[in-house]
Amino acid sequence: MVLVLRVQEACSQEKRLIKSGKFKDVQRANIKLAVNLMLTNYALLDNVNQASTLARGRSQEALNVGVGAVEALQQVLDYFDSSSKSLKVDTISSEKQEFVVKALDVAAQRIDSFLTYLPAAQVDKAKALIAYENDLNLKEYAEQNKGEKYLNPTPGA
């Protein structure tokens, strides 16, 4: 469940990055790479499948909603040409940007819906763990980068 929530967080961060154009390194500017990492590194489909088993009596419904988040992100990879330069933050057309931002929004919303099928106590526990990890990361960053702020903080920050 934590990894599913991390994808939701990554969707928000990527959306802000696209809209602001602020990124620290070249890799972060590649939208297709970021979306691919959300799907593969966080094993979104596998984790949605696994977490849906917690939706007592509504596992299939939960799975269908969660798969919708996967499909929204997959569209970003499938819809555009295979060129690694087709979706760069600094060169993206307004039409492509609108499509990608909508897909990221849909994925985040479907994850929200997916989470409503799961036990609230477990969702809250996973969110608390993420908040704790993010706080540790922020403190570590502040210690190592005196005076610098995060370019793309966690949602709500």
What spans do the regions from the language model cover?
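C-terminal amphipathic alpha-helix
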Residues: 2-14, 75-157
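Alpha-helical segments in soluble extracytoplasmic regions
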Residues: 2-79
